[in-house]
């Protein structure tokens, strides 16, 4: 009986899907969507302090599941992800492994611009960090790294 009690406590401490309490399993990876707002570099340090890094979202199913989680749980605001083109303008890389971020749909936002359809990323040297943008229905957008958004961490 003592063994079963310890097992139950261990399962509750880790969570149903192997993620710690407050984290969610999406695609077999534990994601944490936090309410604190901070610039991108601080968000990265914040995630590293939780034993992970800013999230890599390189799969359309994971992007959809993150969107559904945000909507289902009534979260608001935009969320930092773990990619930037800080090293070389226009070369978007995930910080975890330096792999390239896929361009275009289904990841990056497209919206009506002054001269037709405007495709993200479009911010040039002023917008070098990747955000799940609330104003773009949680598609990828490039943003100024000094803006304050919520971190999405992964472990």
Regions found by a protein language model. Give the residues of each.
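Extracellular, disulfide-bonded carbohydrate-recognition/adhesion ectodomains
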Residues: 1-155
